[in-house]
Amino acid sequence: MKLYEHDGVDLEDGKTVKSGGDKPIPRKIHNRALLSGLAYCISSCSMILVNKFVLSSYNFNAGIFLMLYQNFVSVIIVVGLSLMGLITTEPLTLRLMKVWFPVNVIFVGMLITSMFSLKYINVAMVTVLKNVTNVITAVGEMYLFNKQHDNRVWAALFLMIISAVSGGITDLSFNAVGYAWQIANCFLTASYSLTLRKTMDTAKQVTQSGNLNEFSMVLLNNTLSLPLGLLLSYFFNEMDYLYQTPLLRLPSFWMVMTLSGLLGLAISFTSMWFLHQTGATTYSLVGSLNKIPLSIAGIVLFNVPTSLQNSASILFGLVAGVVFARAKMREKS
């Protein structure tokens, strides 16, 4: 049984296709697209804001444990849905885990550096600095896969670099440690996206069905991250902190952490749903536009000190992200 059914509608081309001889139902399809897009935007924004709340407002100093708990929640839910027959996942064989382990190391590093950077940097600047990932990915595609980008893409990437540099210079709450973690996160995120496709192709060859759906990848990534996360948590001396902190004795804190785990899984589900109801181009553009309300919410909710120059740099970076998304659309078309 699948969670989402496909109605044979290609919204990217503006076409409505009949299903089984029935009359076209564009209103229903557009409502689904709107609902899935709204769910994706809410879950992705909420995830970052809740993580920021846990790390900064609660002053929780165990980012690796937070990631570990979130992934554990995801594993429990995915396994439960699979046992109920609501979703289909591939068996986690030893061969499959061996193939996936290298990319999982990058995945864990990506999550951990994101946690560490979010603790020290305000949400708006994190969203702008994440644009650097696009620059690294574009350069990586050019050198690794001989993929050429047109001038509009490079112009948008140049605008992203300017916005990131100017944003850092004008950031009133600048923190060098946080910026270092975020730059590391950009390199790891780009590495993950560059290696994921090849790893997926290899992994499909060792699965029982010859495929690897999104639910299987969520289960595979999160399951493999648990032992690695435990080792890193011990290496960073988080165990001593966890033993001493009074936060773990607060039911409200566990509720917030569990919510963050549910939101992490919700992003996976809603992104698949939204992508299924619309297409890659709309998904990419909405993802860029989604950073605008996220940045505003981050500044307002956490009382971030800002200046006109820094606000302008942030806005410039967000606009550059939208320009980049549109340039990529035209490049693909």
From Swiss-Prot:
GO process terms (BP): defense response; GDP-fucose transmembrane transport; GDP-mannose transmembrane transport
Disruption phenotype: Dwarf phenotype, necrotic lesions and a constitutive hypersensitive response to salicylic acid induction.
Pfam families in the cross-refs: TPT (PF03151)
Keyword set, alphabetical order: Antiport, Golgi apparatus, Membrane, Sugar transport, Transmembrane, Transmembrane helix, Transport
InterPro entries tied to this protein: Sugar_P_trans_dom, TPT_transporter
Localization of this protein: Golgi apparatus membrane
Gene Ontology CC: one annotated term: Golgi apparatus
Membrane topology label: Multi-pass membrane protein
Function: Involved in the import of GDP-mannose from the cytoplasm into the Golgi lumen. Required for the luminal synthesis of a variety of plant cell surface components. Is required for the correct mannosylation of the glycosylinositol phosphoceramides (GIPC). Can indifferently transport GDP-mannose, GDP-Glucose, GDP-Fucose or GDP-Galactose in vitro.
Family: Belongs to the nucleotide-sugar transporter family. GDP-Mannose:GMP antiporter (GMA) (TC 2.A.7.13) subfamily.
Name of this protein: GDP-mannose transporter GONST1
Gene source species: Arabidopsis thaliana
